[in-house]
Structure formats: C-alpha cells, structure tokens
From Swiss-Prot:
Residues 1-24 have a biased composition (Polar residues). The lineage of its organism: Eukaryota, Viridiplantae, Streptophyta, Embryophyta, Tracheophyta. It comes from the Eukaryota. The keyword Cytoplasm applies. This is Condensin complex subunit 2. Mostly expressed in flower buds and flowers, and, to a lower extent, in roots, stems, leaves and seedlings. Its main location: cytoplasm. Residues 1-33, 404-444, 510-564 are annotated as: Disordered.
Amino acid sequence: MDESLTPNPKQKPASTTTRIQAPTSPFFLGSNDDRLEREQARAARAAASRRRSVIFARGSQPETESDPCFDKQQILELFQNCIKLASENKINQKNTWELNLIDHLCEIIKVEDENNTETNFQKASCTLEAGVKIYSMRVDSVHSEAYKVLGGITRAGHDDGGDHEDAAGAVENATNQKKQPEKKISPLSTLEPSFDALNVKKFDVAFAVDPLYHQTSAQFDEGGAKGLLLNNLGVYGGCQVLFDSQEIPGKLVSSANKHDKSETIDLSFVKECVEQMVLNMRKKDEIVPSLRAIINQFDEENQRPSDTFSCGQQTTESFDISHGNDASYADDDEGYENFGTSFDYEGQSGDVDENFGPNEAEPIYSNFHEEVEPASLQDMDSDDRLENVDDYLFLSLGISSKQNSWAGPDHWKYRKTKGPDVQPASEIKSSPPAKKTRKKKQAEPELDFAKALEEEMPDIFAPPKNPKTLLLPASRTPCQTKLPEDCHYQPENLIKLFLLPNVMCLGRRRRKNSGETSRQQPDDYEHGESWGNDNVYDDDDGPFDDNENDQSDAEDTNTLISQPRQVNKIDVQYDKASKQVDVQVLKETLWECLQESHQPPIQDEEHQQEPPESRSFKVLLASFPDDCQAAERTQDISPHLCFICLLHLANEHNLSLIGSQNLDDLTIHLA
C-alpha cells in the first residue's frame, strides 16, 4: 500500500504502468476501480505540491507540508457541516468557496463496511444535493464578480473615452512621436463627496429638488380647496407671495426698501375727473334705488333725528372751536380751502384735492348745492379732542395698573369700570327711597368637647374592605401650582390695527352742554367726526403726534368711520304654527269657483275693460266658500297656497295670468 502511494514514478515504473493500463479485452468491460483512481489522484496532487514548493523556495530547504488530504474524521465533519448548511439554506456566495464537499464526494459515498455491498442512496442523494447547491453558488459568485469588474471598466471607459479617442487620433496622424501614456483613473470618480450623500434616501432626493411641487401635487390629488396654489404659498410683508421655496423674506424686504423712494406725483390730470365725480355723486351713491320709495314712506317718528346742519346755513358756530385751539381762519372769500375740503354726505365721506384754488373750488360746491340736497356736516361743538388717552384705555379694559399690568392672581379678576350714571331729575324725584336691608348676624358655633369623647373612635389599623384602595396611582396628574408666564402683553395692542401698528382706533369724548340731555349717543364716546376737520386737533398736547393730513382715509389716526344709519325693526305678520291643507281638494274648489257663472262687472277703472271670460283673483278669494274641506278652518287657507294651486291649474287647463300695475290683483283668463 505504501509503495502504491509513492509519488516518485522512477522507483516502481512497472507497477504504476500496469495499473494505469486499460483492460485488453475489447469484449468484456469490468467494474471501475474507484480505489485505484483515488490513489492516483492523491499521488498527482502530492507531486504537484512538491514541485511548487521546490520552485518557490528561496535559499532554504522546503518546509514539510502537511498532507492536503483529509482523514476520515475530517471528511465526516465536513459532510455534517455541509448537510446542516444546506438544510438551513445558509450556503451563499461568501462561504461557498470554503466548503470542499465536491472534492470528497467519493470518500463520503463509498461503502463503509467491506462486507456490506449495498450503497446508502439516501446519504448519496443528500450529499449530491448539497454539492449542487455549493456549485450553483460558486457559479453565481463568479458571474457577479465578473460583472462587477466589467462595470468598473465600462464606467472608466465612458469617463476617459473622449480623451483616448483624441490621443489615438494624434498618434496616427503625427509622425515620429512617442506613444502617449494612458491616464490613470482617479479614485475620486468612484467616491462620494460626503457622508450625507451615502445616507440620503431616494425619497428624500426627490423632495430636495422641489419640495413645494411635491407637496402641491400630493394635496391636489386629494381634491377640494387644499390643492389651490395660494393655500400652499407663503406670504410676507402683508400681501407679498413667496412663489419659490428658496426665497428669504428678509432679503426681499430689504431689496424692496432700497427701491422705494418718496416721489411727488402730479395729480393735476385728475382734476376734471374729480369734478365730474362730485357732480354725479348723488346719482351713484344709492346701492338699491328701488328702496328709495320704501324709505320715504317711513313716519317721521321712526326716522332718526338729524344731528347735522346744512352746508348752506351760514352759521358762525359751525366753525367756532373754543376747546383749547387758537387756530384762526381767513375770510369767507377763500371758500373751503382753509378748513379742509372733506365733506360728509349721508354717512359717506369724500375728499377733494387741496391744490384746486379758491376760485376753482367755489363753483363746484355751489353747483352741487343747487342740484342736490345740502350736504351735512357734523356738529363740531358736540365733540371734544382726545383727553387722557391712557385713562380711557386702561379704565375701559378694566385694568388698574398702567406700568406692567401684572398684579399676581388679581391680574385675572375683571373689575368693572366706574362710568357716570346719569339719571333725569324727574326719575330721581319720582323713585321712592330704597330700603336698606340689614344682614342677619350668624350665631357663633359652640364646641362641645364632652360630646366628642362619647363617640366611638374609628379603628385606623383595621384592614380595608378593598385592598386596592391602598395602592398608589401609577401616574398622577401634575399639580398646577405655578402662575402663568408673564407675556408682558400691552393693552395698547387691542386698539391697534394689525397691518398699521402706528394707528390706534380710539373714540372721542363728548362734552355735554348744560341743560341738554344726551339723546344722540348712548355712551360717552362717539365715533369720529368728518374727515376734513383736522384743525380741531392741531394743538392737542396728547401722547400722539399730529398727522397734518398726510395720510389717506384708510390710515387716518384721528378719526373713525361714522356709525351706520339705524332703522327701527319692522314687525312682519307671519304664521307661527304649522297648518295642514289638502292641496288636491283646494285645487278642485278653485276650479269649481272659476267655472261658475260670470262675475258681475266691476266698476273699477282698472277692471272695466276686462273680457267676459276673465276672473279676478282678489274676487275669487273673497268669494271662497266657507264649507271647503281642504282644511279644518277657512282661516288656515292662505293666499300663497291658493296662488300655488292656481299655477297648477294654469298648466293643466291652459289658463293665462295677467298682473295689474299696482301689484294688488291678478287677472285670470280662461282658455
């Protein structure tokens, strides 16, 4: 056996050649000698390893290599490991080259006992299946590694393709030139510039391009008003819209302020337009012209008393201001130039340019006074300038502190303002004196200490009826023992405009005249005067500066819009209870009334020319039978139900309905 395993063929050439020869008989083929083939394979591997060690040895004797062949115990462990990995499906491309099961299939499948000539096919099938899995994984590993290399070569070729083509053309065209060296691929072409690029997801990359577009498209798919563009765009500076998600409002505002410069605009070209507007103001100031007749029908008692006087009345009291202002006015020859050009007509205010001269302004207002009713100006004697704005602000809000408006727990208590309670003298005399009610004194409780000893003391150490009562709650709600955070909120913000923080909406105090009761306003504060009377507050020493009429109507800090016209409530008589009416019976009753004999001729001039086959709806309702079965009572049948039934009859029997000019009757013509 040892001689057959020797790797040197020179010692025993005869024995080796005799074993390698094929059988000489061409007719009979014996069984294949597996043992001989294994011995030959082992000898060849040993010789090859020995030759390899001799060639690569450098000045020293080759080391004694261990026998690469596994013994029986190692082969058994390899078989068990491969079968376990195959059953658990853990054979992959990483460990497939470490499993040498394919090289030892013969040793595993061979017959263990010499006396047993049968082969274990179950063991052979499991071994073959594990070998197939190992081989397939090796094929996949070779395929993937090869394509990785090809992919790297292709990518490098695309990057440097243009450079190589130019270099090749230069070599072919140029003579006696050296071959250009090939460029090396830079490792930076295969590396990412930052770690964020490696961690980012495809979903985030898609939104990083244009997040506003993705958000808008997602909301648009939902339907409704959420997908509208203005609902998704940001707004800054009042009404400026941010169309780009990368825009910064601060930079846009700063750039816009650089271009904004105060320039003087010449408004002389609108002189004729303003004159025409003033002339046509009476024609266009009515929203619903059809309601003019209804308003004129109101009684004089229902109309509000006028607090104004006519512009045509030349009164010296209208422009007499004696409330601390020393403003002087010029003669009447200057027209309306000095005291302001604004006027108030029926609760509407308008302005005229002050650049119009005195001679140009007079004919405009005189024509307007001749064509329409005289305009009205509010009585300036009934109003006063702003007084003690701080007192009005804090007292009206129920706050007593003016510094920080923070007084601990008392800060949340609302205190009523002390307003002047004015009662007429007649009511004070007629009302009887109120009787003072005395409070009953409560009896002081007496403590009986002897009675407490007679009572049985509870057993505090007794076990509880329910043991769960001794358990503490798992989570307790935190106790609110701290005062709220002081936001330092200023009460002035309540009366400031949101878009115009410098403008404060304040009322004006009204000075009461002696001997007159204030029937025009229910409280001590009334709304602003006409927009033109700015001279009243020129010398005011209040906390606010004079605006000198440099703002528009919408930004005036000294005036408010006048109170709208109030109309008394009109009681409308309508049914307040539900009624049951049989419409079919009502239609039959109306049709029977229409088919009766012709009605007598009407002496009224409006119905004198009616044809004989016509009926009056008013007369029809007057002659309605009392025994109608359409409702329990005849009063339950209303005219509008009869009119609805009449419309049905007109469609069914081809009737024609004609109304009257006064809208108080309806004529029915039979077909």
